[in-house]
Amino acid sequence: FISVSLPREIVNIKKMLQSTIHSKGAEIKWVRDGNMHLSLKFIGHTPETSVDDLNETLKSVTEEFSTISLSIVGSGCFPRRERARTLWVGISGEIDKLDDFVDAINGRLEPLGFPIQERKFIPHVTLARIKYPQKHTPDVTQFLGTTFAELPMKISRINLMSSQLFSKGAVYTILGTHFLVSKA
């Protein structure tokens, strides 16, 4: 997958929001602190032979964009409050520029065999996942109603990541880092 690293302070936001969920036996899997990120594109299983082409392509895209200013703001869930499966924090700021950047990544990777995602890109940071069926549905009302000071961040680089799933969770490895051109 292609992602953006987050400011360290995201951990404080996650901990504060964790305290708002009264799970009463519900199973909620919180993303480990070091694994939180902003996903730009999921590319799925990729042969090692494609990594160089991916990195070369991502480098060419990042060279066409300057730093993107964003903020982490607000909380939400997918698909709906009554049966939330994903708990997240949102992104605001230069969203049009971010959308253009993601579109450019998609457009350049499609000829390499990585299809454009059909779902509209909704920038967010996943904090937790809830699997069903389970005996207790967590009440996410307070999570969704909690406000916090927005956390500014800049996208100045992106990472091509690999993800390996283990019983204790995913382990991410950086396969390439690509820098956006700095603002003068």
Question: What feature does the model see in each segment?
Answer:
Residues F1-A184:
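Histidine-dependent nucleotide/RNA phosphoesterase domain, centered on the 2H-phosphoesterase fold
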